[in-house]
A protein has these predicted regions:
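Sec-dependent N-terminal signal peptides
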Residues: 2-12
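Cleaved targeting-peptide boundary
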Residues: 11-21, 183
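Secretory pathway targeting signatures of secreted, lumenal, and periplasmic proteins
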Residues: 19-74
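Surface-exposed amphipathic alpha-helical segments
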Residues: 22, 28-33, 122-166
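Short, surface-exposed beta-strand/loop "edge" segments at domain boundaries and coil↔beta transitions
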Residues: 51-59, 67-73, 107-112, 124-125, ...
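Short, solvent-exposed aromatic-acidic interface loops
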Residues: 64-69, 76-81, 130-134
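C-terminal single-pass membrane-anchor helix
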Residues: 158-192
Length: 192
């Protein structure tokens, strides 16, 4: 019975997918399509809260394509504008860097913006989550939950994959060294 309820809950959750970019994730509860957000360049899709929790407006979640893969080099705080801070998010076993910023909207209301880049194998994407400043803590939790549900292959190697490749490379170098030594010993014996 518990498995049936779990399966039903999963079916009721809305999934965002892109076969072209190779990802799938569960949309936060209460978020619905926001086609106006796709008007910006390279936006794949956007969603907003159907019923905003805050009286100051709805939160918006968007996916933007990056037209390339993401390297592992870290951003430096000194390269960021003064109003932007580095934050971190978890995806699979990777620590992703993100940006947090507060901005003034029309009418003087403050809004937060959270951005993180996801190193998908086919093409990296950026996830944006923005909303009223009074919802920032909730927004951070929603972006973390979204990343936790995001499925897709990464172009980054996990620590296990890196160790495996290092072990394979070391094995080849050892095999080459043994072969060279064997040839030298064989030549010496023939010359003697």
């Amino acid at each position: 019975m518990t498995h049936l309820l779990s399966a039903l809950v999963l079916l009721l959750q809305t999934q965002a997918t892109s076969a072209e970019l190779g990802y799938r994730f569960t949309l936060p509860s209460g978020f619905t399509a926001f086609p106006e957000g796709r008007a910006q360049k390279d936006m794949v899709d956007c969603w907003s809260e159907a019923t905003p929790v805050s009286a100051h407006g709805a939160m918006i979640l968007c996916v933007q394509r990056m037209h390339g893969v993401l390297p592992r080099e870290a951003m430096k705080p000194e390269d960021l504008p003064a109003s932007t801070q580095l934050v971190s998010f978890k995806w699979k076993e990777f620590d992703l860097q993100g940006l947090r910023s507060l901005a003034s909207q029309q009418g003087g209301e403050q809004a937060f913006v959270l951005v993180t880049q996801v190193p998908l194998r086919r093409e990296a994407v950026q996830l944006f989550l923005s909303g009223p400043a009074d919802q920032e803590v909730r927004g951070q939790a929603l972006l973390s939950e979204t990343l936790a549900s995001l499925e897709g292959e990464s172009n980054w190697l996990t620590s296990t994959e890196r160790a495996g490749r290092l072990g394979t490379a070391a094995g080849w170098w050892i095999a080459i060294a043994v072969a060279v030594i064997a040839v030298l010993v064989w030549k010496r014996r023939r010359a003697a």
